Regions:
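Short beta-strand-centered segments at strand-helix junctions
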Residues: 20-33, 83-88
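Residues that act as N-cap/strand-start positions at coil-to-secondary-structure junctions
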Residues: 9, 34, 101-103
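Glycine-rich loop/turn
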Residues: 1-19
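Acidic (E/D-rich), amphipathic helical modules within compact regulatory domains
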Residues: 30-48, 53
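Mature exported/compartmentalized surface modules and terminal targeting/interaction regions
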Residues: 1-3, 45-124
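Short, exposed beta-strand/loop patches in secreted or surface proteins that constitute
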Residues: 13-16, 40-42, 104-109
Length: 124
């Protein structure tokens, strides 16, 4: 008998952008498991969104402005950051039209800077 066992390849990290929120798949959610809040930003010249997880200690330390920290919902199979103002800024800066159903982009973890980047150069 020559049995070939199925071994599913790991999925890449993805982020789905809508006008109201960013939803991360299970692979990307791994990086937010211990996040209490996140910081969100973007680099217009590199066409990336940056999401930095903050531990509870870092979020409550007092050296990060309250207006720079955002809540994240972390579930077993996805995570989500909801902020319409940020998403409108992303649409304006990157000239995107995000439908309610969303657009999906690949995400990458940056070990050196300890944040997740969302590559807006190519929609999945």
């Amino acid at each position: 008998m020559d049995i070939k066992w199925f071994n599913e390849s790991p999925k890449s990290a993805t982020a789905t952008l809508t006008p109201a929120h960013i939803t991360f798949n299970k692979t990307a959610t791994h990086y937010f498991k211990k996040a209490f809040q996140v910081m969100m930003g973007y680099d217009a010249s590199s066409f990336i969104i940056v999401i930095k997880p903050l531990s509870k200690a870092a979020a409550l330390r007092g050296n990060i402005s309250e207006t720079s920290k955002y809540n994240i919902t972390v579930k077993s199979s996805y995570s989500r950051v909801t902020n319409k103002a940020f998403m409108q800024t992303i649409q304006d800066v990157f000239n995107l039209e995000l439908p309610e159903t969303g657009r999906k982009y690949e995400a990458f973890w940056d070990d050196k800077n300890e944040f997740l980047t969302v590559n807006l150069k190519e929609e999945l």
